[in-house]
């Protein structure tokens, strides 16, 4: 069982940012790190101290996806570092150059 270091309000703020500003990155993360190459969309649906949760659209079906963090997070500022790491690793796995 995982523990959360983040309040529901903080999780909602992070999810809103990821979904509004990084929707394409969410898809790359799911494709590259979860190995779901047919994902056509993905939205962050939650997170805790150990990982980020997404709902991926695969063949018009919503599929839950969990991407673990590299280590347990204890502070909000660590989330950005992990999200960037996930994006960069996903790009590498897919043979793409990161655009940011």
Describe the residue ranges of each PLM region:
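Binding-site signature for planar aromatic cofactors or substrates
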Residues: 1-100
């Amino acid at each position: 069982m995982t523990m959360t270091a983040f309040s529901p309000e903080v999780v909602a703020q992070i999810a809103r940012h990821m979904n509004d500003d990084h929707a394409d990155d969410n898809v790359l993360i799911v494709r590259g790190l979860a190995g779901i190459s047919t994902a056509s969309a993905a939205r962050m649906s939650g997170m805790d101290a150990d990982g980020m949760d997404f709902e991926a659209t695969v063949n018009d079906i919503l599929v839950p996806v969990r991407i673990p963090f590299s280590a347990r997070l204890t502070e909000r500022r660590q989330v950005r570092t992990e999200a960037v790491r996930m994006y960069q690793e996903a790009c590498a796995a897919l043979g793409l150059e990161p655009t940011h």
